[in-house]
C-alpha cells in the first residue's frame, strides 16, 4: 500500500504571511517607478471593488506585477532589463 511522502523540504511560511511580504516588496518597488497618486488611486479602486479581502490583496499583487513587468520591458531608465532603442545610421546603412 502506497503512502504519501513525508514533507522533507524546508518549512514554508503560511500563505498569508508570504502574500503580505510579497505585497510589501511590490509596493516598495512600485513607489520607485510610478507616481504615488497613481498607486493611491489603484489602491482605492481595489478597495472599492474587493473591500478588505484576500481577493483584493491577490488582485493588487497581480496588477502591480503586470505594471512593473511592462514598465521594465518597455525600458525603465533605472533598469538594465528592457528594449534598447538603437539609433539608426543617417546614411541609411543597416546593421544586419
Swiss-Prot record:
Keywords: Activator, AIDS, Apoptosis, Cell cycle, Host G2/M cell cycle arrest by virus, Host nucleus, Host-virus interaction, Ion channel, Ion transport, Modulation of host cell cycle by virus, Phosphoprotein, Transcription, Transcription regulation, Transport, Viral penetration into host nucleus, Virion, Virus entry into host cell. It holds the Pfam family VPR. GO terms for cellular component: host cell; host cell nucleus; host extracellular space; virion component. The modification Phosphoserine is found at residues 79, 94, 96. It comes from the Viruses. Phosphorylated on several residues by host. These phosphorylations regulate VPR activity for the nuclear import of the HIV-1 pre-integration complex. One of its GO terms (biological process) is viral penetration into host nucleus. Residues 1-42 are annotated as: Homooligomerization. InterPro entries: RetroV_VpR/X. Homooligomer, may form homodimer. Interacts with p6-gag region of the Pr55 Gag precursor protein through a (Leu-X-X)4 motif near the C-terminus of the P6gag protein. Interacts with host UNG. May interact with host RAD23A/HHR23A. Interacts with host VPRBP/DCAF1, leading to hijack the CUL4A-RBX1-DDB1-DCAF1/VPRBP complex, mediating ubiquitination of host proteins such as TERT and ZGPAT and arrest of the cell cycle in G2 phase. During virus replication, may deplete host UNG protein, and incude G2-M cell cycle arrest. Acts by targeting specific host proteins for degradation by the 26S proteasome, through association with the cellular CUL4A-DDB1 E3 ligase complex by direct interaction with host VPRPB/DCAF-1. Cell cycle arrest reportedly occurs within hours of infection and is not blocked by antiviral agents, suggesting that it is initiated by the VPR carried into the virion. Additionally, VPR induces apoptosis in a cell cycle dependent manner suggesting that these two effects are mechanistically linked. During virus entry, plays a role in the transport of the viral pre-integration (PIC) complex to the host nucleus. This function is crucial for viral infection of non-dividing macrophages. May act directly at the nuclear pore complex, by binding nucleoporins phenylalanine-glycine (FG)-repeat regions. HIV-1 lineages are divided in three main groups, M (for Major), O (for Outlier), and N (for New, or Non-M, Non-O). The vast majority of strains found worldwide belong to the group M. Group O seems to be endemic to and largely confined to Cameroon and neighboring countries in West Central Africa, where these viruses represent a small minority of HIV-1 strains. The group N is represented by a limited number of isolates from Cameroonian persons. The group M is further subdivided in 9 clades or subtypes (A to D, F to H, J and K). It is found in: Virion; Host nucleus; Host extracellular space. Its main location: virion. This is Protein Vpr.
